[in-house]
């Protein structure tokens, strides 16, 4: 049944879901399934396999909750066959909790107290709605704890109110109406005007619950968490209460007065707060999911940023008072030299710094400069460009997360004898060479490409970001003989322990000559090898296929292709025209389908190639260094640094990034900023607004005003 529910929810064929679930339960990873098991999944891509896994996890969790509910009700002796069937047939968490509510262990409530005082029979009489002498009946319930008939009736109404609040139909009716027509409203907490000025847009704001945007709701939530705002759900209480009256108060009821009072109290005191909490939690989850989706997509783009490649680099972590930390790196990213120069105020040793940088570039045959884009970054870039070093590229590199890495255990382990400034400069240089290999060492949340990342569900955020890192690492593949344990950790089927074992084995035994040698690594068994091998590359090894995305389990197919063509595997790999003549369907059999054969041929064409784009040179406007240099209407080059649901932030070479609102991204309607821009994209923007008080810069990419 689980697979059928998933297929229905995702709109994917049952056979595809069944194949995917079987592989997931067998311990296969998402990258492995989507890349090497297309016959089993009907060629589902990574996102679809991930969606199946997410639904499977949710339904597994729901199944566990159902067992808890069944057990609890069973212990109360109230589990009927009909109730068991209803619970077992339930596949929605909200519905399950509604069924469970009347049986759920409670704290002491007004209704609990009323029952303890023996008022349940009176409540039953009122709910029967056919007795005209309730006031006289109530006198029989007068005791020391219930001194008057009025108090007896009030207690009985408390019991009725709780029953109404636990009625599935009633809760569903209120939930549907409030979700469809309700609005989320934020208002200022009295006396917080100055403290909460940044939330001024939300001091008295209302948005339809169905359509409130992720960033707007999360901003409200953050304001609430900081004690500046209060949030509530506005709903038509009178109309909803009237609907409940129609459900519970019969026409011609003899106890109408008390029933209507109990229903109104039930809605105001019990149902509304409960449904309001539920709806706000659902809105929070929806907003979290959208914010996490945006963060994950930004992270994916950043991790797959174009690498400069294995080049000799001079990296600079700029600064004013503390100077610029300079490091020289070889083409493998190893630290060769470090020093500090002081070209900027207050020291102003410009000529000395220029000579030092020129000398280092010559001594270490530098092919590029990597300059951090933080404090003093533009000034340092100007200095380096002014050196006039022919054939040496100059690149600005994002510093986001570099300070986190430099103070981390990973950095201390690699550079125990150097301080955080040296480690930070090394990270900047390596990030230019290969962003992916360097960024995997940093907690993804510290990279700075999120939207309200500290306000969303942290466990869900971390799980999603880890999935993205795994996806990117396995998409690119890694060289088994140069990869750090940090990047190996994310390879399909490995994890930290096996990554450390691989690095230790490599250090003790030298480079791996082929993929099969991985099986000699301690604790790396057949299952881990199956999951990992296709994503690990052996460059210049014994078997040329080891430097491709072809899985070892499919080598025999390539060998057949070569044999059929009358050539060796090496000759087949070297001759693109020969490969063009291969007919994939000839190699399809009961074990291997057309998708796998097609992927094999594609992998042979791309053997040894990096799937990432080529790095492009870029420079900011040399006349713009601060907000004071900006004028409305001026056109500037920029780099997209962050993408949100409401637009894109662009670095224009000053301390503060500008915002291109979604409405200003193009001369047409834009549904999502990601449809128009990507991280690191070089764009041309026009300044449309400068707010020096709130430190905001408005930009536009529209050509027609």
Where are these regions (language model features)?
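A glycine-rich phosphate-binding loop feature that marks nucleotide/adenosyl-phosphate handling sites
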Residues: 176-182, 316-320, 374-379, 397-404, ...
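C-terminal accessory/binding modules appended to enzymatic or scaffolding proteins
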Residues: 11-12, 306-308, 470-504, 622-660, ...
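Long, charged amphipathic helices and adjacent flexible linkers at domain junctions
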Residues: 278-296, 411, 446-477, 586-632
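Accessory alpha-helical DNA-binding modules that contact the DNA backbone or grooves
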Residues: 29-30, 45-147, 475-614, 621, ...
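Long, charge-rich intrinsically disordered scaffolds of nucleic-acid metabolism proteins
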Residues: 95, 395, 401, 406-476, ...
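Duplex nucleic acid-engaging cores and interfaces of nucleic-acid transaction enzymes
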Residues: 45-51, 58, 62-72, 76-315, ...
């Amino acid at each position: 049944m689980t697979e059928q529910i998933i297929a229905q929810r995702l709109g994917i064929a049952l056979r595809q879901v069944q194949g995917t679930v079987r592989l997931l339960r067998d311990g296969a990873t998402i990258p492995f399934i989507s890349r090497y098991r297309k016959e089993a999944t009907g060629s589902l891509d990574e996102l679809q396999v991930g969606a199946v896994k997410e639904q499977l996890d949710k339904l597994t969790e729901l199944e566990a909750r159902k067992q808890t509910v069944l057990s609890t009700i069973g212990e109360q002796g109230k589990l009927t066959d009909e109730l068991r069937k209803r619970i077992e047939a339930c596949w929605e968490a909200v519905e399950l909790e509604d069924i469970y509510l009347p049986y759920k262990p409670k704290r002491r409530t007004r209704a609990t107290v009323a029952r303890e005082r023996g008022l349940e029979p009176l409540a039953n009489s009122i709910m029967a709605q056919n007795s005209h002498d309730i006031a006289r009946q109530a006198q029989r319930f007068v005791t020391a704890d219930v001194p008057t008939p009025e108090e007896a009736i009030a207690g009985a109404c408390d019991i009725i109110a709780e029953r109404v609040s636990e009625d599935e139909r009633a809760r569903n009716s209120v939930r549907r109406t409030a979700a469809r027509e309700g609005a989320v409203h934020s208002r200022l907490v009295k006396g917080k005007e100055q403290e909460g000025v940044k939330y001024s847009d939300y001091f008295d704001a209302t948005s339809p619950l169905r359509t409130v945007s992720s960033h707007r709701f999360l901003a409200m939530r953050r304001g609430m968490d900081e004690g500046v705002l209060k949030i509530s759900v506005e709903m038509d209480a009178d109309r909803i209460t009237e609907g409940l009256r129609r459900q519970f108060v019969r026409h011609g009821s003899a106890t109408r007065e008390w029933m209507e009072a109990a229903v109104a109290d039930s809605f105001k005191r019990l149902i509304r707060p409960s449904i309001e909490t539920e709806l706000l939690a659902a809105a929070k989850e929806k907003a979290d999911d959208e914010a996490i989706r945006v963060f994950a997509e930004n992270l994916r783009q950043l991790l797959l940023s174009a690498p400069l490649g294995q080049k000799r680099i001079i990296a600079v972590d700029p600064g004013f008072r503390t100077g610029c930390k300079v490091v020289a790196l070889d083409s493998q990213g190893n630290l060769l030299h470090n020093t500090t120069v002081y070209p900027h105020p207050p020291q102003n040793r410009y000529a000395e710094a220029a000579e030092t940088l020129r000398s280092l570039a010559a001594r270490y045959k530098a092919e590029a400069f990597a300059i951090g884009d933080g404090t003093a970054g533009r000034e340092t870039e100007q200095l380096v460009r002014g050196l006039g070093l022919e054939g040496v590229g100059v690149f600005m590199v994002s510093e986001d997360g570099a300070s986190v890495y430099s103070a981390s255990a990973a950095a201390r382990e690699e550079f125990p004898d150097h301080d955080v400034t040296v480690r930070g400069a090394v990270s900047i240089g390596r990030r230019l060479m290969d962003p992916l290999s360097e960024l995997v060492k940093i907690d993804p949340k510290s990279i700075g490409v999120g939207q309200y990342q500290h306000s969303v569900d942290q466990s869900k955020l971390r799980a999603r970001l880890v999935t993205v890192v795994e996806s990117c690492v396995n998409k690119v593949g890694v060289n088994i003989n140069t990869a750090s344990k940090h990047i190996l950790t994310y390879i399909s089927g490995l994890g930290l322990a096996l990554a450390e074992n691989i690095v230790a084995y490599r250090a003790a035994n030298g480079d791996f000559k082929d993929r099969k040698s991985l099986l000699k690594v301690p604790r790396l068994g057949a299952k881990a090898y199956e999951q990992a091998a296709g994503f690990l590359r052996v460059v210049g090894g014994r078997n040329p296929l080891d430097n491709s995305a072809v899985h070892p389990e499919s080598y025999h197919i390539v060998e057949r292709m070569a044999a059929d063509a009358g050539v060796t595997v090496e000759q087949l790999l070297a001759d693109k025209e020969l490969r063009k003549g291969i007919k994939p369907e000839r190699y399809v059999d009961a074990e291997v389908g057309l998708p796998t054969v097609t992927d094999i041929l594609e992998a042979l064409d791309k053997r040894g190639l990096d799937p990432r784009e080529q790095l492009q040179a870029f420079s900011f406007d040399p006349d713009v260094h601060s907000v004071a240099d900006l004028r409305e209407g001026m056109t500037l080059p920029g780099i997209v640094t962050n993408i949100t649901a409401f637009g894109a932030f662009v670095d224009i070479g000053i301390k503060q990034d500008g915002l291109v609102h979604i409405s200003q991204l193009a001369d047409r309607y834009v549904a999502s900023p990601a449809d128009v821009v990507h991280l690191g994209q070089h764009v041309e923007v026009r300044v449309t607004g400068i707010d020096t008080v709130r430190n905001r810069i408005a930009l536009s990419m529209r050509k027609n005003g």
